[in-house]
Amino acid sequence: MEGYQRPCDEVGFNADEAHNIVKECVDGVLGGNDYNENNINQWTASIVEQSITHLVKLGKAYKYIVTCAVVQRSPYGFHTASSCFWDTTSDGTCTIRWENRTMNCIVNVFAVAIVL
């Protein structure tokens, strides 16, 4: 993968660091926009691609999975769940919730440690 660096010896997934990276990506893509059904595919693709790119640039020994859902805001709410079976000492996840007056966005990051 382009931009991949030899992993450092840090153990454990830093969810705060990943959260901040992905939040910046979401702000950059969705910030200032209103919900538009015609833009959803482009927006979600941009969010996951930018997030993966920035996470990989950290040079840590992880495989990343990033999911993104953008829905029009409604009084009915938006519910999502995920579950993982893995090594909690090295693998990790974080969820980023973003909203404005017209839409809600949920991004999940899953980081699975690469054991060499």
UniProtKB/Swiss-Prot annotation:
Residues recorded with modification 3'-nitrotyrosine: Y4
Organism name: Mus musculus (Mouse)
Family label: Belongs to the dynein light chain Tctex-type family.
InterPro entries: Tctex-1-like, Tctex-1-like_sf
Domain of life: Eukaryota
Protein name, entry field: Dynein light chain Tctex-type 3
Subcellular localization, as worded in the UniProt entry: Nucleus; Cytoplasm, Cytoskeleton; Chromosome, Centromere, Kinetochore
PANTHER family hit by this protein: DYNEIN LIGHT CHAIN TCTEX-TYPE 3, T-COMPLEX-ASSOCIATED-TESTIS-EXPRESSED 1/ DYNEIN LIGHT CHAIN
Entry's Gene Ontology cellular component terms: cytoplasmic dynein complex; kinetochore; mitotic spindle astral microtubule; nucleus
Primary residence: nucleus
Cited function: Acts as one of several non-catalytic accessory components of the cytoplasmic dynein 1 complex that are thought to be involved in linking dynein to cargos and to adapter proteins that regulate dynein function. Cytoplasmic dynein 1 acts as a motor for the intracellular retrograde motility of vesicles and organelles along microtubules. Probably binds BUB3 as part of transport cargo. Required for the efficient progression through mitosis.
GO terms under biological process: cell division; positive regulation of mitotic cell cycle; regulation of mitotic cell cycle
GO molecular function annotation: identical protein binding
Pfam family membership, one: Tctex-1
Subunit composition and interactions: Homodimer. The cytoplasmic dynein 1 complex consists of two catalytic heavy chains (HCs) and a number of non-catalytic subunits presented by intermediate chains (ICs), light intermediate chains (LICs) and light chains (LCs); the composition seems to vary in respect to the IC, LIC and LC composition. The heavy chain homodimer serves as a scaffold for the probable homodimeric assembly of the respective non-catalytic subunits. The ICs and LICs bind directly to the HC dimer and the LCs assemble on the IC dimer. DYNLT1 and DYNLT3 compete for association with dynein IC (DYNC1I1 or DYNC1I2).
Keywords of this entry: Cell cycle, Cell division, Centromere, Chromosome, Cytoplasm, Cytoskeleton, Dynein, Kinetochore, Microtubule, Mitosis, Motor protein, Nitration, Nucleus, Transport
